[in-house]
Amino acid sequence: MAAKVKAIPEGFNTLTPHIVVREALKAIEFYKKAFGAEEVARMPGPDGKSIMHAELKFGNSMLMICEEFPEMCRSPQAIGGSPVTLHLYVEDADAVFQRAVKAGATATMPLADMFWGDRYGKLNDPFGHEWSVATHKKDVTPEECMKAAAEFCGPKPAGKK
């Protein structure tokens, strides 16, 4: 009797981001260089040049990528941006952030030690996707986090609740 097929394939988690990019080959190389991603799979598109599907491993997580095909899926450039941020936890946020900028990302929020306990910053990749990069530095209780958030956000202007 054949073994039961797993509902979630080996190496994947329950939730796996699947992004659309223009120039998927360049995006794959960027993610490898900037974030240390490992290419796991690649399926060429019908023209033999584009990427219909690719899988990259970031630590213990997977990211699926496909080329923009206007009749099926559109990139952030085609729709005027993306409201989604891909969050990446790493051992050394400073090193990864610098490497990503050197590889072509644009820093949009410099790295800083944040009130929730992470060293955290944000950047945009050359393909229209926003990334946050963080290293968890300190465990913070929900109460400590709420207090620190209030201090971080500062006093509210008069008449505002």
PLM-predicted stretches and their roles:
Residues 1-22, 28-29, 33-124, 133-161:
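Vicinal oxygen chelate
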